[in-house]
């Protein structure tokens, strides 16, 4: 197990904990992007990165106010020399079917299609062993991390299939290959997310859909606020790392990446340069081998 974990973490030799020059020049002019969990942390950073890359329209989805994110995105776009994007803010709970259906309907009526969907909304839940906390709190993590991604994907796929990029990025966790005690709701839900992503990739590949899972790095956010202080030294990555990484990876359709699990700590140009090796060896898939 330890060998497999090490092989995955070090699959790409060059690694990063912050954004770097090679991924800061993505081009998203003409693209429409939707992001869940966009009000803070990684979601906000992803939105700002797309803004800086000239995205034409951005759909920000969250339960909390998004006015600050909207203004930050527009400022980043203008500062980078682009025309201000159309930024649509949608108040929605991804785990509520009616809420996300109404959100998708609003987006359809306003924009008609999307090119890229980033399922970033997530929940960690109570830190502690299986006896800690309440059962409802434990299950709520699955409601957000699995049901929420399912409902959002289900609602937005028709619009994605009308777009150019037809790409879904689901935010995963390194814990699926390197288990951590006291996260019995969060980590299994992220493992299930990988399989869900793979199934979506299989079901819609003939229609041109690309779907992959990305580990964003260890970024300190509101989600990690319940972690013990002893965990703090592990959170060494900036939100800008996943923000710029996702924008860079999705500027082109990477069909060969569909159904795979990648780390955004990896040097992405180096990762892409190994496409043939990855495809021929069927690498970067989370499977059981006996």
Swiss-Prot record:
Give the similarity note.
Answer: Belongs to the short-chain dehydrogenases/reductases (SDR) family.
State whether keyword Ion transport applies. no
Functional description taken from the UniProt entry: Short chain dehydrogenase; part of the gene cluster that mediates the biosynthesis of anditomin, a fungal meroterpenoid. The first step of the pathway is the synthesis of 3,5-dimethylorsellinic acid (DMOA) by the polyketide synthase andM. DMOA is then converted to the phthalide compound 5,7-dihydroxy-4,6-dimethylphthalide (DHDMP) by the cytochrome P450 monooxygenase andK, which is further prenylated by the prenyltransferase andD to yield farnesyl-DHDMP. Further epoxidation by the FAD-dependent monooxygenase andE leads to epoxyfarnesyl-DHDMP.
Phenotype of the disruptant?
Answer: Impairs the synthesis of anditomin but accumulates andilesin D.
Name recorded for this polypeptide: Short chain dehydrogenase andI
Q: Which GO terms describe its biological process?
A: terpenoid biosynthetic process
Q: Which organism is it from?
A: Emericella variicolor
Q: Which residues bind NADP(+)?
A: 35, 120, 154, 186, 190, 219, 221
Q: Which InterPro entries match?
A: NAD(P)-bd_dom_sf, SDR_fam
The record's section on SUPFAM superfamilies has: NAD(P)-binding Rossmann-fold domains
Q: In which pathway does it act?
A: Secondary metabolite biosynthesis; terpenoid biosynthesis
What is the active site of this protein?
186, 190
């Amino acid at each position: 197990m330890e060998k497999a974990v090490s092989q995955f973490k070090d699959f790409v030799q060059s690694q990063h904990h912050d954004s770097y020059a090679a991924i800061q020049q993505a081009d998203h002019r003409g693209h429409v992007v939707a992001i869940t969990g966009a009000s803070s942390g990684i979601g906000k950073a992803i939105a700002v990165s797309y803004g800086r890359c000239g995205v034409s329209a951005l759909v920000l989805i969250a339960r909390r106010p998004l006015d600050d994110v909207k203004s930050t995105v527009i400022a980043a776009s203008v500062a980078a020399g682009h025309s201000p994007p159309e930024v649509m803010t949608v108040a929605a709970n991804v785990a509520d079917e009616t809420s996300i259906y109404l959100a998708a309907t609003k987006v359809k009526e306003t924009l008609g299609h999307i090119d890229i969907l980033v399922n970033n909304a997530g929940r960690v839940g109570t830190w502690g062993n299986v006896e800690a906390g309440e059962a409802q709190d434990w299950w709520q993590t699955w409601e957000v991390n699995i049901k929420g991604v399912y409902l959002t994907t289900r609602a937005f796929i028709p619009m994605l299939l009308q777009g150019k990029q037809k790409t879904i990025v689901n935010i995963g966790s390194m814990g699926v290959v390197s288990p951590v005690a006291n996260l019995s709701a969060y980590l299994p839900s992220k493992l299930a997310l990988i399989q869900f992503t793979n199934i979506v990739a299989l079901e819609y590949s003939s229609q041109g859909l690309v779907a992959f899972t990305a580990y964003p790095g260890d970024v300190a956010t509101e989600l990690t606020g319940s972690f013990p202080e002893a965990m703090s030294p592990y959170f060494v990555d900036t939100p800008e790392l996943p923000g710029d990484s996702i924008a860079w990876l999705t500027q082109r359709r990477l069909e060969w990446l569909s159904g795979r699990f990648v780390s955004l700590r990896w040097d992405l140009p180096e990762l892409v340069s190994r496409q043939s090796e990855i495809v021929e060896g069927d690498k970067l898939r989370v499977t059981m081998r006996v």
